[in-house]
Amino acid sequence: MDEKTTYPKFAYDATKIIVYGGGGLSKMIIESVRVLGVYQIVGIIDDNMQEGEDVLGSPVLGGAEELPKLFEEGVRMAVNSVGGIGNYKVRLKVFHTLADAGFVCPPIVHPTAHVDPSARLEAGVLVLAQSYVSGNARVGMGTLINNSVVISHDCVV
């Protein structure tokens, strides 16, 4: 008798990720995610853009109302690309929306950035190109470290 090997069907695909926000910052985030080579961008969620538009070739899927459908399809990862310069509450609201819908926001570190092994990055941290996070630094949830920024040793951000 020939046995056929079967594998379990997992409830989600850890390589699929959505980008929440389609503005200017999203272009830097999309490029960072692509060159990282870990995730496949499923699309953009943006409450102020039309479904079918695209940002750097990634399709706009709709607004926050699409999150339950994406979750049902097995997408669990998200990156917050809403800037909110001068008003962190805008970014924080997006993190709450994503968490309430069951999504996880992993840290994203551009391959040209360097994070020392003793540094700690919390959920949703974005470390963009040419940045450096030094020894024993702590970078708090959702922090955006823009291009070419240095976070020195023992700093708490």
Feature names for model-found ranges:
Residues 2-82:
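A solvent-exposed beta-alpha-beta segment
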Residues 28, 89, 116:
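Residues that form or flank phosphate/diphosphate-binding pockets in enzymes
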Residues 30-32, 91-94, 139:
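Short amphipathic alpha-helical segments
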Residues 59, 104, 150:
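Residue-level detector of anion-binding/catalytic polar loops
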Residues 59-62, 96-97, 124-126:
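Short, hinge-like loop/turn segments at secondary-structure boundaries
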Residues 69, 86-87, 134:
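Short glycine-rich, flexible loops that bind phosphorylated cofactors or substrates
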Residues 80-108:
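Glycine/small-residue-rich loop that forms an oxyanion/phosphate-binding "nest" at active or ligand-binding sites
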Residues 107-157:
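Structural signal for interior beta-strand "rungs" in well-ordered beta-sheet cores
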